Amino acid sequence: MALASLAVSAAAPAFAQKGILLEDLTWIEAEKVLTPDTVVVIPLGAESKEHGPHLKLKNDFVMAEYFKRQVLARANVVVAPTVNYSFYPAFVEYPGTTTLRFETARDMFVDICRALSRHGPRRFYALNTGVSTMRPLEAAATVLNAEGIRFGYTNILEAGAAAEKAVSKQEGGTHADEIETSIMLYIDPASVDMSKAVKDYHPSEKSGLTRDPKKPGAYSASGAYGDATLATREKGEAVVQAILQTVLKDIEKLRQTP
């Protein structure tokens, strides 16, 4: 059964949908679409990770869910349930932040892909919304590729880089900053409180954010790293569209990989 036809029958979405949600299927339906030609997309976004005083802990999860919907509408893929925990050691000083050990974050994706590959699929794509997550994803790719399972992931630093450079006005930043806040103003403005947005940028050669100016790392009392006060919806739209096009190209490139 074709993915597109099963997507319509299984979920009855209000919009044209090319892909399907694995969670909406029975195992009998899943067996029909989990074939060697299938690309399985696994969204990844933290649902409990600090993003300054103006963005929610669920920020990355909301972002992952947004891109998941866009991919479902545009790509012939099977989308697995969103993974909402991973490797975020840079933010552990801020309450509400959760992180997995590197090995756990790596092995979670290895295990998910191995389990689904038993039934046919050999190509998997992590729809990644984090920076520190790329390390365990790269390690997972090494393990899986050695087993003949192709695994790709979004390099979030590169995906929207050109668009970011074109619109960004901040001195620097990478977290809960001008760009990330702009993205959220575009995809989920209700989750942003611009009255609490701040500029908090203290570069450091040491990785990770810290609430203590005497500790190694980039000092940030707010948990932000950059200038969120410069964020606009229009900037967010430009970056989101650039990231989406990169993700779609990544998926099609993976589909063509032997």
Model-derived segments and their meaning:
Residues 4-6, 215:
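Alpha-helical interaction segments
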Residues 9-11:
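N-terminal signal peptide c-region/cleavage motif recognized by signal peptidases
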